[in-house]
Amino acid sequence: MFLIRTINIDPRGCHDIDDVVSLWEEGGVWTLAISIADVAAFAALNPALLFAEKIGQTLYTSGGKALRPMFPLKFSEDIFSLLPGEERFAVSLFAKWDGTILYDIQWKECIVRNWASYTYENCKDCSEINMDVLYKIVTSLGEETGDTHKWVEYLMLFYNSEAAAVLKRAGAGLLRIHGEPEKELLARLESLSLPANELAYPAAVYATTDTVGGHWGLRKDAYCHASSPIRRYADVLNQEVLKAVLRGGQGTHVSYKHYALALNRLDKSAKAYERDCRFVDCILGAPGAPVHGIVVELLNGKTSIYCYDWKRMIRCKTGATLTMGDQVLIGFYVNMTTASWKNRIVYHVERV
C-alpha cells in the first residue's frame, strides 16, 4: 500500500496514531481501506510489552495529553504510531463502494505509509484523497453531518463491527456488551428533561464471544474494540485473533474470560478517573460558587441530584425536605481532614 494515498485525521498534537484511511478509484470502482497499527505483531515478539495488560488503557489529562501511556512513549508515539512518511505494519479492512453501500469486505495484513496528517479542523482541505466521496461513505454509515469527529467515529464503528463478526465466527477474542437502560430510571430522567442517554444507560463491558447480547447503545448485534491497540489492551487481544484468522487459524488459546474480568476492572477505574478529573476541574473552576441542580431520586436517606453545571449526578444527605423534580441550589466546601477526596466535598442543598 505504499502507492495508495493514505491519511490520518486526529486531534491537534496527536502522536499516538492508531488509524489511517485510504480511498482510491480503480476501473471505475472506489475502494476504502481502514488500516490500524499492528501492535500485536510487536507484542508477540517482545513479551515485556505484555505488561500493558496490567494497565489496560492509556489515561489522558483533560487537555488530551497522555498521562499514563499503556505502552512506553518510544513505542506508542514512534514505533507503533502510523506517523506520516513512515512504513508501518497494519491490519486493514478493505471495502468496495457502489455509491450507496460498502460491500466485498476483506481483511489483510499490510505495510502502509501515511502520506499526510490532518486535524479535525483542516481535514476537509485534504488533497490526498477524495473527501467528497469519503463524506458520502461516512453518511451511509451514520448520518449526514459536517462534523469530522463523527466521520472518523463512523469509520471506526464500521471497522469494529466488522471485526466483531470475525471474532464471533472464530469463537475467540473479547466483545463489547451493552445492555438496555433501566426503564424506570429512563422514564424518570426523560420526565425531568435530563440527558437520559448518559445517566440511565449501564456501562458497557468486555465479554467472551459466547456471551448472549449485543451493544444496545450502538444498535449492534456484535461489537468489539479493535481500532485503538496503541491505547487499549482489549484491542491488542482482538487484533491477535484477527491476524490468526487471516493466517488460517481460529485465534490464540488464552483465557478470554480472565481478560474480560481484569479489563473490566481496569476500565471501571479509568472511567472513574476521567469522571473525577472533570468533576475536580469544575470544583476548582469556581470554588465555593453555588450551582443549580434538580432532585432525581430519594433513597436510603440520601438524595440524588443532577447538577447542570457539572453535568453529573451527586448523592448526598440533605437537611431539607425535598421531592423529585425540585429545583435546588447546591453550595459546597472542602474539608481536608477526611481521607477520601470525595468525602472532602461537603454539600449544602436548598430548595430554590
Which role fits each region the language model picked out?
Residues 1-352:
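Electropositive polyanion-binding surfaces
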